[in-house]
Amino acid sequence: MKKVGYFFYTFVPLLAVEAIQTIALFFMMGMGMFGQGFVGKLAFPSANVSDRLEKTFTSVNFNMMIMIIYALITIAIFGMWYYARYEGNFLPSPKKTFNPMMLVAIVILVPGTQFAANFIANLTGYIRPDWLQQYNKLFETSGITDTTFVTVLYSVILAPICEELIFRDVTMRCARKALPFALANLMQAALFGLFHLNWIQGIYAFALGIVLGYVCERGGSIYYSMGLHLLFNLWGTLSGFFPDPGNSVVVFVVVIVVTIVSLVVGFVLFNKGRRKLPINSTGI
């Protein structure tokens, strides 16, 4: 009976995150209405309040502030949740948790996971062009596509920490109390995909979530999945500055080969390094 309870409890973190996002949204809307409606009216009596509010609510900075506030609140809540409820250890013993071979493996996995995610996104977009249009529109309005200090802060640092605490920490630990690792990993990855609220990103996030869950569980530390997630997002953020290789057959073959080699070598090194760690050590 307890396992059934834990199974349904696994959905609570996702619901809590949605609530936090709503709170952050209403907080920023309230601040915007106060700033533009009350203070703005005093400073600029002739200004049209509704136009100023519309401009504020649709601005990139406004959207980014919502995400940053949400991320900071989520990191605090889920960090305490995991520490208190699941005895999380955020200061693990380096000798018992980290192995140089595993750290190198995380870096090697980055191009493979990025290329695989892009392939999944492109294939999904080819099958459903309407999903691709929605995905592109979402990114354009969110401001994530603009490479600024704020977007890098959120995308590369805050988002990976936030999402790993939600899904590979709290959600995974809860699911593990009801299911074997393989099913628990699929469940947290599915919730991770659902969290993104669009088909394109949700499908490749599901695949990425499986890899992150495996790395976290087998590595015995949330820092492995955080590191991979951070580097994955960093690659995506900086990819706009990479030269365009074109769409030739040669480029396609090279990308496929790099993807396969990256994933195979990365996982082999990771598991080889894991076997060198003390038995049953954990730094999650």
Regions found by a protein language model. Give the residues of each.
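Membrane-interface segments at the starts/ends of alpha-helical transmembrane spans
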Residues: 7-10, 45-66, 140-145, 244-251
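Alpha-helical transmembrane segments in multi-pass membrane proteins
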Residues: 18-85
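Functionally important transmembrane alpha-helices
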Residues: 18-27, 189, 200-256
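Function-critical hydrophobic alpha-helical transmembrane segments in multi-pass membrane proteins
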Residues: 112-117, 137-199
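Juxtamembrane helix-loop-helix connectors linking adjacent transmembrane helices
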Residues: 42, 55-57, 88-159, 280-284
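Hydrophobic core of alpha-helical transmembrane segments in multi-pass integral membrane proteins
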Residues: 71-81, 108-114, 253-272
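Membrane-interface capping segments at transmembrane-helix boundaries
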Residues: 83-89, 267-282
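Alpha-helical transmembrane segments
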Residues: 6-21, 104-113
